[in-house]
Amino acid sequence: MDPCDCAKTGTCNCGTSCTCANCSCTKCKKSCCECCPSGCSKCASGCACKDKTCDTNCCQ
């Protein structure tokens, strides 16, 4: 189960790993909501996410 579940409240905060608003990841160190593109299990540390995806170069 994804601890960062925006579906229920529209916002979430996974400690220091992720902060989301309206199901868009505003910062991401680990997989959060729909921040990472398909096939990307987590974003690299410090990766900046835009809208609901991060650049594939951020993937680990």
Swiss-Prot record:
Disulfide bonds: none annotated. PROSITE patterns: METALLOTHIONEIN_VRT (PS00203). A divalent metal cation 2 binds at residues 6, 12, 14, 25. A divalent metal cation 3 binds at residues 14, 18, 23, 28. A divalent metal cation 5 binds at residues 33, 35-36, 49. Residues 1-28 are annotated as: Beta. A divalent metal cation 7 binds at residues 49, 54, 58-59. A divalent metal cation 1 binds at residues 4, 6, 20, 23. Residues 29-60 are annotated as: Alpha. SUPFAM superfamilies: Metallothionein (SSF57868). GO terms for molecular function: metal ion binding. A divalent metal cation 6 binds at residues 36, 40, 43, 59. A divalent metal cation 4 binds at residues 32-33, 43, 47. Keywords: Metal-binding, Metal-thiolate cluster. Metallothioneins have a high content of cysteine residues that bind various heavy metals. Class I metallothioneins contain 2 metal-binding domains: four divalent ions are chelated within cluster A of the alpha domain and are coordinated via cysteinyl thiolate bridges to 11 cysteine ligands. Cluster B, the corresponding region within the beta domain, can ligate three divalent ions to 9 cysteines. Belongs to the metallothionein superfamily. Type 1 family. This is Metallothionein. It comes from Gadus morhua. The lineage of its organism: Eukaryota, Metazoa, Chordata, Craniata, Vertebrata.
